[in-house]
Amino acid sequence: MATTHAPAEPPKRRRIGVLTSGGDAPGMNGAVRAVVRMAIYSGCEAYAVYEGYEGLVHGGDMIRQVHWEDVRGWLSRGGTLIGSARSMAFRERAGRLKAAKNMIVRGIDALVVCGGDGSLTGADLFRSEWPGLLEELVKTGELTEEQIVPYKVLNIVGLVGSIDNDMSGTDATIGCYSSLTRICDAVDDVFDTAYSHQRGFVIEVMGRHCGWLALMSAISTGADWLFIPEMPPREGWEDDMCDIITKNRQERGKRRTIVIVAEGAHDRQLNKITSSKIKDILTNRLDLDTRVTVLGHTQRGGAACAYDRTLSTLQGVEAVRAVLDMTPESPSPVITVRENKLLRTPLMDAVKATKEVADLIHERKFDEAMHLRDSEFKEYHFAYKNTATPDHPKLILPENKRMRIAIIHVGAPAGGMNQATRAAVAYCQTRGHTALAVHNGFPGLCRHHADTPVSSVREVSWEEQDTWVNEGGSDIGTNRSLPSEDFETTAKCFEKFKFDGLFVVGGFEAFTAVSQLRQAREKYPAFKIPMVVLPATISNNVPGTEYSLGSDTCLNTLIDFCDAIRQSASSSRRRVFVVETQGGKSGYVATTAGLAVGASAVYIPEEGIDIKMLARDIDFLRNNFAHDKGANRAGKIILRNETASSTYTTQVIADMIKEEAKGRFESRAAVPGHFQQGGKPSPMDRIRALRMAIRCMQHIETFSGKSADEIAADELSATVIGVKGSQVLFSQMGGPNGLEATETDWARRRPKDEFWLDLQSTVNILSGRASFGEGKTGWSCYENC
């Protein structure tokens, strides 16, 4: 057999291949775009393998070099634009032999695979067989010894693309939050018809072996009952379900009933629980007009949400870095995420743990299966069970342990505020505490606490909090006023209503309010109670956390806005939109949105704006448009934080670009303003609100029975709950090591150390701005387009 001609010498630049395999997931295109552009920026060549492993086996035109501009506009596209397939040929050694030959012919020695556990298992098997495959290719005369010398080692990096979020070792997989968004949108829409006709709806969602989508959608929509594969219902579940639904409708006045069921749901004997069976039970036993809605493949479709765009982009960049860092001895990694931190996890360890869960379910070892799920999954399941209904007599505390906990919103409205309050109230009612909502912030407390017949301080009923499950903004009212405006009256109100704990939901003003109360404890003993801040602000500028409720809702609203105006810009071919974002003196929203929409440039207050920067960026735009040559998706977006510069305003920048363009392209200013606060909260803000609010209540509970002086002496009696790296933790506000002294930039109303600042360089790399004018590969690729 004739030997195939392949490069005898290794190419001057390393060649990295990227493929998507298995079921498609929103965000896969973002991952491919990031791999391609980061590879080019790093001096490598990027190759796309079309139609998954099938393309690797067939070779030829199914393995193509991809240039910088080839992936323009991919972030907002759903599915996978390089195709995906479940390849039977690659499962056989003969198929993998062909794949190895095709890779060597193309000079590719590294592969980034985006897919589920099956796809990643195949990738690791391919790597383990690689030396044997090369040896066989030489023996059969397909390749020569000289041809395989540069390719003795195959580096493989995995990215988990799966809407089910079924991979162990990671909090989220690419596509899972986009799918969850589709489900929540559908259930939110069902609410109206269910309420109108007092109907019940059984909603079937995807998830054969993993109940993540079902659990998170149940939390996000306040479902009455839930079925997931990992934790089947106990014997007699039919009676339990009917009892809860009957109580919710007859005693609590609910007009709608929602039951969420994962497609892989079963009982403890592994008998399948179908949506039609559940419908029949509700219809026959409760005489409830019930409908079944099977969402099906709508859960896979559509553009990726903000989180999936950001996650896929950052993981794609990290995958290229991992390839370049790997040695012949390095195990294949999969890029995972824990809370807010990217990690490199041994691929086979993650795959093994994932398969073990499915095996344990099949063996009916359900407790062990739950144990192998991430701790976050178990925590959410516990939270759902204990907030879906107040009927938990075993959890009720004795009288002397019960507390009166005030809940107040401070600052601007943010998505998730209502959900945090709902979760706190539900938990309090489950435990026997009294939850007191303070309406309209501290002014409401001081001015209207004695109003009749309705005081601004009042208990929240189960029926009232249940209506907040998908509501945006703040139903109890919020404003920016602080307690220092009237300490005397505030303290008297604390005494009058006998507050034993304070739960404050809000932004930097909430942080400031608790700081003021803490510092006033010596003069006002009423403030010697445990106080917790749950950050909720679109600006994400609260010290002690890398995530604030509302920031994800804001980003989703903003990318929808940017996608729409980019379409306008692209339709006009040569147009730049300068979009003004909110965020105060923190550039988090602008930078993260810039990453999610593929902005050409992002201006933030941390860096400021000067004339040299603008001149360089205008040259950058000129170069962009000069090389477009009528290409599609040619519209450009620039994001500017509202306080990035007092001189170079959004309109001024747009006018400067238009003037300097000399008619070759044009620009427009766009200010979405308060539209960025969003409508209904995103699923991420809903579920994190539940988890963090319950943790806050549990933290306040630890102070039950302590004296006022004991509480004041405890540095954790005034805290902020937050995400830091891979952990969720409480950070003390006071003391020499507290947030107030060490992490707060009071003048600029933001943390001193902003974790996201490194993202700015990633935005610049992927837009090409970082390498413009430096002769880097990122722009020489235009000559090859």
From Swiss-Prot:
The yes or no answer to whether the keyword Kinase is present is yes
Q: Where do the catalytic residues lie?
A: 164 (proton acceptor)
Please provide an example of a Pfam family that matches this protein in its UniProt record. PFK
Q: Which cofactor does it need?
A: Mg(2+)
Q: Name one GO cellular component term.
A: 6-phosphofructokinase complex
Keywords of this protein's UniProt record, alphabetized? Answer: Allosteric enzyme, ATP-binding, Cytoplasm, Glycolysis, Kinase, Magnesium, Metal-binding, Nucleotide-binding, Transferase
Q: Where is this region: Interdomain linker?
A: 390-403
The protein's Enzyme Commission number: 2.7.1.11
Quaternary structure annotation from Swiss-Prot or TrEMBL: Homotetramer.
Q: Which family does it belong to?
A: Belongs to the phosphofructokinase type A (PFKA) family. ATP-dependent PFK group I subfamily. Eukaryotic two domain clade 'E' sub-subfamily.
The name this protein carries in UniProt is ATP-dependent 6-phosphofructokinase 1
